[in-house]
Amino acid sequence: MNIRPLHDRVIVERQEVESKSAGGIVLTGSAAEKSTRGTVLAVGKGRILENGTVQPLDVKVGDSVIFAEGYGTKSEKIDGKEVLIMSENDIMAIVE
């Protein structure tokens, strides 16, 4: 299935995090944090400004990003893979 986000939306696949503590203890359940890093899979055409022009997004497909998982982030399962759909505003940084 192909999916194309609209406007300033971005589709991100969450990167797995190490589920061990610094002391080597395996963390489970609520002790294991969900990663706030991911890889951009698809981007919309851009944000529509008040004057009607489209401002392209700063992120692009393949970027590794750090994001804030907030109320606007939606989790979906596409082709058996869990992805996050979010606004570019929820992305805090691009990891280079």
Curated annotation (Swiss-Prot):
Belongs to the GroES chaperonin family. Together with the chaperonin GroEL, plays an essential role in assisting protein folding. The GroEL-GroES system forms a nano-cage that allows encapsulation of the non-native substrate proteins and provides a physical environment optimized to promote and accelerate protein folding. GroES binds to the apical surface of the GroEL ring, thereby capping the opening of the GroEL channel. SMART domains: Cpn10 (SM00883). It comes from Aliivibrio fischeri (strain ATCC 700601 / ES114) (Vibrio fischeri). This is Co-chaperonin GroES. InterPro entries: Chaperonin_GroES, Chaperonin_GroES_sf, Chaprnonin_Cpn10_CS, GroES-like_sf. One of its GO terms (biological process) is chaperone cofactor-dependent protein refolding. It is found in: Cytoplasm. One of its GO terms (cellular component) is cytoplasm. It holds the Pfam family Cpn10. PANTHER family: 10 KDA HEAT SHOCK PROTEIN, CO-CHAPERONIN GROES. Keywords: Chaperone, Cytoplasm. Heptamer of 7 subunits arranged in a ring. Interacts with the chaperonin GroEL. One of its GO terms (molecular function) is protein folding chaperone. Its main location: cytoplasm.
